[in-house]
Amino acid sequence: MRSRSSIAVWRSPTRPSRNAVLALAFAALAFAGAAHAQDAASAPKRPVHTFSIVARDPATGELGVAVQSHWFSVGPIVPWVEAGVGAVATQSFVDPSYGKLGLDLMRAGKSAPEALKALIAGDAASDVRQVAMIDTQGRVAAHTGAKDIQAAGHKVGTNYSVQANLMLNDTVWPAMSRAFEAAKGDLADRMLAALDAAQAAGGDIRGRQSAALILVSGKPTGKPWIDRIFDLRVDDNPEPLKELRRLVVLQRAYNHMNAGDLAVERKDNQGALREYSAAAALAPGSTEMVYWHAVALVNMGRVDESLPLFRQVFKADKNWLTLTPRLVTAGQLPKDQKVIDRILKAAN
């Protein structure tokens, strides 16, 4: 099986008092307002006109942002999400500092409405911003500036906000709201449904180019690389939502692979096989997944079951055949030459 590296994380030996936390929150609020005002005054106005959704799943606590725009590489600019803290979408003539500072304030104890109010108050150009925030308790706030290019608006609902600007018409964000509330599935499915509804209602008057989706766990570990369930970007594509959906399915498959690896580590062989099978069903063309499934079977002592999978992979690409003996030295396959020979003969 694939090994997992661990990184030691420094942790404070003492827990700060409630008063200390509150003091930090107020200090962060003052600092954020000053920093934001300075940033807003000097930063260029990036015209990331777009539609987006910020949302929380009340059942799981998951938080997410999904967005599409006719602007190159919208992913690094608009969506900001942190497990255990909140989610922010900052767009229109965008000031990215709303994302970082909004999360800073919510982390320090401010609600989403309090954080957004403070940042707007410190922004001399708030009339061209469009921002939405949600915190871990589902408290939501949104702002559409008076000078955002029309059609522009937002709608706040229970555990979500949808917002859009530079749209073909003013039916876009109401359509997003209806779609999100009616959609089935998990939070990613529902956010994608909202984006699809926006596009179907007319979408960005200029067209479409990029999209992104970030979704984090409702059970934060303090390790962002674990907490992020989806962190996907489509930077430049004529059909960004179709490509984003494809990536979501592929990410689900890899999530199953990771869950299978963890099951192997727990000696839960049946659980591992269920996860690997689920991954294969979602990504039937992936030789990578088939290969590591086969490796896991060998490490379970189920060599006979692994051979057809190895044969399938070796037929697709001989480089996997070259790789296989190297896994022995790396500790990913047993130091049993008879077993390795059987695997390699599967290529014949």
PLM features: residue spans?
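Alpha/propeptide regions of enzymes that mature by internal proteolysis
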Residues: 38-206, 213, 235-266, 281
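Canonical tetratricopeptide repeat
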Residues: 258, 292, 326-327
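Canonical positions in the second alpha-helix
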Residues: 279, 312-313
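Residue-level recognition of tetratricopeptide repeat
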Residues: 261-262, 295, 329
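Short coil turns that delineate tetratricopeptide repeat
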Residues: 284, 318-319
